[in-house]
């Protein structure tokens, strides 16, 4: 999804109003994906992962999920509020959820000693770590939110 977003920006000659670094990792599953290589001066970290879907959750495959809290604690209140406002302003179909059995790369960034505001979003995905199912509506909602948040 991030590569498609970067291609969209490049193909259309769009430059975000803020500096954006893309950090793609394959270590999220072992808990240290975002713990290193954060450039100096970075003040926010936004993980774009999957949005959980299931019993007791508000998310669906047709929405972008904004995680307010996971197994390690709450995400930055100010950043989560900005993400919710960006979702509303962009018209993205969204849900705010708590994931009690989940951890993200941006949480690893904090454990790595970086001091930044942090947030987590993702397109709704049903049945993770198996036969994962998502819907283009959830992907589109995620991209709408991301574009609004990054001010493109």
Q: At which residue positions do the language-model features occur?
A:
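Acidic/histidine-rich catalytic neighborhood of metal-dependent amide-processing enzymes
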Residues: 1-70, 106
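Active-site-adjacent substrate-binding region
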Residues: 64-152
């Amino acid at each position: 999804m991030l590569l498609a977003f970067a291609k969209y920006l490049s193909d259309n000659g769009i430059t975000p109003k803020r500096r954006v670094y893309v950090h793609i990792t394959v270590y999220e599953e072992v808990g240290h994906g975002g713990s290193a290589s954060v450039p100096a001066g970075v003040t926010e970290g936004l993980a774009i992962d999957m949005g959980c879907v299931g019993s007791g959750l508000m998310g669906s495959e047709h929405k972008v999920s904004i995680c307010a809290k996971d197994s390690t604690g709450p995400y930055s209140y100010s950043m989560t509020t900005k993400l919710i406002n960006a979702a509303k302003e962009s018209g993205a179909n969204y849900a705010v959820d708590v994931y009690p059995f989940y951890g993200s790369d941006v949480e690893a960034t904090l454990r790595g000693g970086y001091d930044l505001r942090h947030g987590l979003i993702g397109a709704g995905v049903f049945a993770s770590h198996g036969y994962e199912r998502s819907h283009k509506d959830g992907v589109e909602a995620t991209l709408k939110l991301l574009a609004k948040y990054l001010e493109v």
